[in-house]
Amino acid sequence: MVLEHARIGDMQGLREIWNNGGTTLGGWVSLASPVTAEVTARAGFDYVCIDTQHGAVEYSDVVAMIPAIELGGGRPIARAPWNEPGIIGKLLDAGAHGVIIPMVNTVEEARAAVRACRYAPDGARSSGPTLVQMRTDRPYFDWAHDNVACIPMIETVQAVENIDAILAVPGIDAIYVGPSDLSISLGLGPGNHDESAAFTDALDLISAACARAGVVAGIHSTGALTPDRLRRGYRMVTATGDLQAMKFGLSTELAQARGESSGAESSMY
């Protein structure tokens, strides 16, 4: 029933929003649950990302979760486990509107990411939209050309040093900062380190480079940190995820039931 009613052409695409100067706020799903995916979308996020890198999600789960997100009014994207064309192609064939691709550190790796996301002549993606073609009246080849978003991750010092060259690769729609891995690469340990000038300077350098190149700057965040990231020029910001919201909500409700202050804070992981 979900497949019957979820249609990939029924909403404005992420690329169209970005091309019109818009900002997108997203949710993150790490649990293998179409219900969780749909609930996250119904909360009102512009996109919902299914995490197949660090989440507990297999491909068969992705196939069910993508139409659930669309049914909830969201735009499904997925994070690939690695910059590997077969995996990226399968996520797109399942109906993802875009793919976040980890650990893109060089121009060569950025070109590989684009090739995996694009059909010829712009790339080398294999054509076989067996699943996704059922959910659009438009030829999927044409829809993908106009809508699929290629989103390499910037999460190391090496990637920051190469940021201008990476952004110059044709076919990149947005980049996505992984703040925890970036912090580790900076020698700060995992997490957000807004107290460190090295960390915030890197965030500002990335967003400024994106503005110059006309590429959307994206970042993993928390609800509390999202206003700061927007102020720094990030236009694709993931504000929370299913596990984080569940942990925060359960802790808060339990504290209220006990008549206590929870002291709970939202987190990225």
Regions found by a protein language model. Give the residues of each.
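Expand to "…catalyze enediolate/carbanion chemistry for C-C bond making/breaking, isomerization
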Residues: 1-269
